[in-house]
Regions:
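RNA pseudouridine synthases
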Residues: 1-237
Length: 237
């Protein structure tokens, strides 16, 4: 993923926070030597605005590299501390949109699993409760729209997380028989060249200084979302 001008992806900015629409294909942080990541691009942007000053950018949360969506950063340590407290206490709320392949067991539901991460393969899997190293994962999903393709039924879902585990949405949905379109890790047998259809489409926070509730939304740009009418699910951008 190549970003020509990071300013094209900035949704909101003031003296305390900076909010971006992270495109799919770029890491939020530490992508490795020679690889571009969003943190580095934004630090360069801040440095150009404030010549002679060391740029500060606090990473509050991350999205997986193939996932697009809203990401908030802090522009000073005080704002970072306030936002981190919100993250720890569950006050920062994220709403995801996803496209799944195959039939659904209903129009909405709750998934509750125990997930264990494998650091060697950078994957997670559902295991039995009580498995060493496993963590409880809970999410809620709701059907928004369905479209029938030549090969399969596809569904646009709204997903809300109660917990935040490694690859949680991707693992739980695949384990429940509702794999995400384009997921090469957890739905490889049905994945062609389509990108992963997962977007953190809405983010709600309290401003770290004023306490004002703020909500940011983005319209998914991924190919798999284009078959659906997004007008009723996110504000037009």
């Amino acid at each position: 993923m190549w970003i020509k001008d990071v300013r094209d992806y900035i949704i909101y900015e003031d003296k305390e926070i900076l909010v971006c629409h992270k495109p799919a294909g770029i890491a939020v942080q530490s992508a490795g030597v020679g690889n571009m990541d969003l943190e580095s691009l934004l630090k360069n942007y801040i440095a150009r605005k404030q010549p002679g000053k060391m740029p500060y950018l606090g990473v509050i949360h991350r999205l997986d590299q193939p996932v697009e969506g809203v990401v908030v950063f802090a522009l000073n340590p005080k704002a970072a501390a306030a936002l981190n407290r919100q993250m720890t206490s569950g006050q920062i709320r994220k709403t995801y949109l996803a496209v799944t392949a195959g039939d659904l067991p209903g129009k909405e539901g709750k998934l509750e699993d125990w997930l264990k991460k494998d650091g060697r393969t950078n994957t997670s899997r559902a295991v039995k409760e009580g498995t060493e190293g496993a963590k409880k994962a809970v999410l809620y999903w709701k059907l928004l729209e369905t479209k029938e393709t030549v090969d399969e039924m596809r569904s646009l879902l709204e997903i809300r997380l109660e917990t935040g585990r490694h690859h949680q949405i991707r693992v739980q949905m695949a384990n429940a028989g509702m794999p995400l379109v384009g997921d090469r890790k957890y739905n490889p047998e049905k994945t062609g060249r389509e990108p992963l259809c997962l977007c953190s489409a809405a983010l709600e926070i309290r401003h770290p200084m004023t306490g004002k509730k703020m909500q940011f939304q983005v319209r998914p740009a991924g190919e798999g979302f284009q078959a659906f009418d997004m007008e009723g699910y996110v504000d037009k951008k």
